[in-house]
Amino acid sequence: MNSANPCCDPITCKPKKGEHCVSGPCCRNCKFLNPGTICKKGRGDNLNDYCTGVSSDCPRNPWKSEEED
């Protein structure tokens, strides 16, 4: 049970009615971050990872191709 989280229903620990998410890199104030919001900066051959706007997870983006150098 996570009663300290304002997004979390204390009984089910799922998002409260009307809220999108409880936690995650793409969740802020119980709502999904906008699509295209950087959730993880790229390093080396990895590109930036971006929020989708429909999930609190930060999906992995593909590696940079040689054409992008």
Swiss-Prot record:
Q: Which UniProt keywords apply?
A: Cell adhesion impairing toxin, Disulfide bond, Hemostasis impairing toxin, Platelet aggregation inhibiting toxin, Secreted, Toxin
Cellular compartment(s): Secreted
Specify the superkingdom: Eukaryota
**SMART domains according to UniProt:** DISIN
State one molecular function term (GO).
toxin activity
Subunit field text? Heterodimer with EMF10B; disulfide-linked.
- Tell me, what does this protein do in biology? Extremely potent and selective inhibitor of integrin alpha-5/beta-1 (ITGA5/ITGB1). Partially inhibits adhesion of cells expressing alpha-IIb/beta-3 (ITGA2B/ITGB3), alpha-V/beta-3 (ITGAV/ITGB3), and alpha-4/beta-1 (ITGA4/ITGB1) to appropriate ligands only at concentration higher than 500 nM. Weakly inhibits ADP-induced platelet aggregation.
* Name of the molecule in the record: Disintegrin EMF10A
UniProt source species: Eristicophis macmahoni (Leaf-nosed viper)
